[in-house]
Amino acid sequence: MIIITGSKGFIGQNFLKYLLEHSKEEIITVHEKDAWDWIAFFNDWDKVSLILHQGAISDTTETNIDKLHAMNVWYSIELFEKAIQYQIPVKFASSASVYGNQQGIVNPLNYYAITKLQMDYYIQDHMTEFSSIQS
């Protein structure tokens, strides 16, 4: 079983299309509006072989930092903790809005980029626990 968060986004759509054409595994897609309910009630973690975590509120004009932080940071942490508990590999994507084409000091362009950078730092800080997570 493969879980894809953010399957309506560009990268998620392409992952989904590829997997539908090339994989025989069951695919579960998770969307923003039901993400918290899904993670709370999903009980088949032991059957999951891979999590493709592309889901985030990616609206670069969103100014509600609490909303962004809840979905882009806290939800991601919950998902990663499930991955650790069940030893599920995770593929996670950062964002060009965090790094752009710059060298040196990171200067996120918007609140969305700030939350993505927070997750990048979180993963770096917990790499020994998150040995199955690749960004």
Predicted feature residues:
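NAD(P)H-binding glycine-rich loop region in Rossmannoid oxidoreductase-like domains
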Residues: 38-71, 82, 98-102
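Conserved Rossmann-fold NAD(P)-dependent oxidoreductase catalytic core, especially the SDR/UDP-sugar
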Residues: 77-111, 131-134
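N-terminal Rossmann NAD(P)H-binding glycine-rich loop of SDR-like oxidoreductase domains
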Residues: 1-22
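Structural motif
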Residues: 1, 49-50, 89
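Adenosine-cofactor binding site in Rossmann-like domains, unifying the SAM/SAH pocket
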Residues: 26-43
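Rossmann-fold NAD(P)-dependent oxidoreductase module
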Residues: 14, 18, 82, 122
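Active-site Tyr-X1-5-Lys
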Residues: 109-135
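Short alpha-helix in the Rossmann-fold core of NAD(P)-dependent oxidoreductases
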Residues: 69-76, 80-83, 115-116
